Amino acid sequence: MRIMLDLNILLDVVQRREPFYAASAEVLSHALETSNVACLPGHALTTLHYIVAKYADREQANTLVDWLLAHLEVVAQDRSQFVRARSLDIADFEDAALASAAEASGCELIITRNVADFQASPVPAFTPEEFLLASTAERAPEGAG
């Protein structure tokens, strides 16, 4: 399954933001340890680099970007995706751009802490907890539950 990670999930992990860190870190681990393909829109790399360089340092920001490039699929974004994003009834343009990238790259879902912001998304959005609960149910042996 292809899943698009919202920027807030990665920031939860990178900045160890409580009370969100545990669930977001588990989502990231799950995505890396299973056959899921974790995706990230290209525009998120520059945002993450900027935030980490500002609040930590440039070396840590570079290390993070290198790690993301090695472990996640970075989805290219072009003009047509941004035009599509503008056509979506999503108030925040960054969220609309992420939804458009998810749609164009064949992602089946978006993982975000702000599900309400993605109600008009062409790709359904789930919280980390919802995703983990569904993933656990899928891996449960028959007769479990």
Regions found by a protein language model. Give the residues of each.
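Short beta-strand segments at enzyme active-site cores
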Residues: L40-G42, T112
